[in-house]
């Protein structure tokens, strides 16, 4: 969806001290988690070098958050561990993500109040493309901001500044919610209101955060 508004329309929501136009939501640990069984499915390919394999996969993931192809990086990992199976067999997309439907319903409720909502997440290109194409997020969010597309990753200032440029609002009118303290600090450094979210805290954790800004679910 675009972010154009009718001339003169004011959709800000907030308390006397803070007026918000946008809420940015992190994905993993806030709106979604790894699907049950995914880790077991992945590590079965690397026994008995499971720990070493997981470290290599994690390193490939981090190296690709700002645009490098994760598929190419992972195929190199598979060669190193002498895994002959194709990548899409080793990493089954069906096991990647389990969305928290109550949290998505809460995002809809926030939008119904007149606020714009965006996904703001660090993702490598394969996982990010899967999220964009397969989870229906285009019907939930006004915008989706993936690090692999922006060329910056949280907590870099460039990540948050690029989003501010895209949505064309002052940072003081934006709330960012993330489960990693470093990312929250990065948002605050450029003037965004940042709130730390307890991992998989659900709507019970989201409601009081929003209430501090005058947004009632």
Question: Language model features by range: what are they?
Answer:
Residues 2-23, 120, 124-217:
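Asp-based, Mg2+/Mn2+-dependent phosphohydrolase catalytic module
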Residues 9-58, 189:
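Active-site neighborhood of HAD-like aspartate-dependent phosphohydrolases
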Residues 37-41, 56-59, 72-76, 105, ...:
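Alpha-helical elements of Rossmann-like donor-binding domains used by nucleotide-donor carbohydrate transfer enzymes
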Residues 45-48, 81, 198-203:
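Hydrophobic/basic alpha-helical segments enriched in Actinobacteria
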Residues 47-57, 81-92, 215-217:
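Short, surface-exposed acidic
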Residues 48, 83, 115, 169, ...:
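Short glycine/serine/threonine/alanine-rich loop segments
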Residues 62-90:
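A metal-dependent, Asp-based hydrolase signature
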Residues 90-117, 157:
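Short, acidic loop-to-helix structural element flanking the phosphoryl-transfer center
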């Amino acid at each position: 969806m675009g972010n154009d508004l009718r001339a003169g329309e004011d959709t800000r929501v907030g308390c006397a001290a803070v007026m918000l136009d946008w809420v940015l939501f992190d994905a993993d640990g806030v709106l979604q988690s790894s699907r049950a069984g995914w880790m077991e499915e992945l590590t079965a390919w690397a026994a008995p070098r499971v720990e070493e394999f997981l470290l290599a996969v994690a390193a490939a993931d981090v190296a690709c958050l700002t645009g490098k192809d994760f598929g190419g990086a992972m195929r190199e990992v598979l060669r190193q561990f002498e895994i002959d199976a194709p990548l899409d067999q080793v990493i089954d997309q069906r096991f990647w993500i389990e969305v928290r439907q109550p949290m998505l319903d809460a995002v809809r409720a926030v939008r119904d109040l007149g606020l714009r909502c965006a996904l703001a997440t660090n993702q490598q290109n394969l996982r990010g493309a899967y999220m964009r194409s397969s989870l229906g997020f285009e019907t939930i969010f006004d915008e989706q901001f993936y690090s692999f597309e922006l060329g910056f990753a949280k907590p870099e200032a460039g990540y948050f500044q690029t989003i501010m440029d895209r949505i064309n609002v002052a940072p003081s009118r934006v709330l960012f919610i993330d489960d990693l303290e470093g990312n929250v600090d990065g948002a605050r450094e450029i003037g965004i209101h940042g709130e730390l979210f307890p991992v998989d805290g659900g709507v019970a954790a989201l409601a009081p955060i929003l209430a501090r800004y005058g947004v009632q679910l």
